């Protein structure tokens, strides 16, 4: 582990020099790249230096103890040494966690797609509940959300809805939401009081940068059409809605707000995210064939969570977590679940690192 930490510290010092280089300062792309890399290493270097400083202080105290026989001074030095020794295990654990490879997409904005699945009208209502839950959660973090495309249900909620969440670390917070969500509750229209089960699927796609997805204009088919609201009513008087098809993959993205220019930009953003996501899914499948992760972020058909309204209970099936706070969770209080999922994934990765004698 310490060999790797030395390499990290050495790279940090190299970046300090590079960021002072006039050639780098004049190149905005390199300056941004190196600044981000240095920022990513900062915490690890700070903790490692604190660890080394504490070790050095302990060695100094040991040397001082060998040079004195004054009881009061010996007692004071030993107390200081024990206090420093007590910090080492915690710092070592923190360093192990900091060495866990970071998901390169964690800091990105996301596109979230929610689709009603089994359960008819109730599934659409549940899709609406999930949308509200995620927007409230995002607002609590200071993130901005924006609807790209929605297909309303006649009885409330959405048959499907896609929207953006923009903010530092959005993907790191939302990536565990990929999969099938199940709800168990008595519908308002159910006179017999029977509990119905419905599902909705959630896809969380990291926004793709141009350098990550090369999409040529010649590979795009762009169409405009008239958007319609619930019940088929026309909500636009012009053909402002946009549909973009990526011909090599057949991936389609649409946006149907009022501005055709904004729709084109939004649809293209979603298209890039979907093409990038397809690439990530292929890489994930390759990884999963070698190791099966308990906390998946890929399989969209995997049932990941159940929301049981009568018992005010939410269960995340991937880690066996059950929380009796459904009323708070659907209002956007997702932190307890997300923190548990993050810790579970980090623990798995730490085990893998330990297996290769890090």
Curated annotation (Swiss-Prot):
Listed A to Z, the keywords are: Cytoplasm, Methylation, Protein biosynthesis
Q: Which residues carry this modification: N5-methylglutamine?
A: 233
PROSITE patterns in the record: RF_PROK_I
Which Cys-Cys disulphide bridges does the record give? none
Q: What is its main location?
A: cytoplasm
Cellular localization per UniProt: Cytoplasm
Coiled-coil positions are none
Gene Ontology molecular function: translation release factor activity, codon specific
Post-translationally, this protein is described as follows, namely: Methylated by PrmC. Methylation increases the termination efficiency of RF1.
Q: Would you name any one GO CC term? A: cytoplasm
Q: Which family does it belong to?
A: Belongs to the prokaryotic/mitochondrial release factor family.
What function is annotated for this protein?
Answer: Peptide chain release factor 1 directs the termination of translation in response to the peptide chain termination codons UAG and UAA.
Q: Which HAMAP family match?
A: Rel_fac_1
Protein name from the UniProt record = Peptide chain release factor 1
Per the UniProt record, the lineage of the source organism begins with: Bacteria, Bacillati, Bacillota, Bacilli, Bacillales
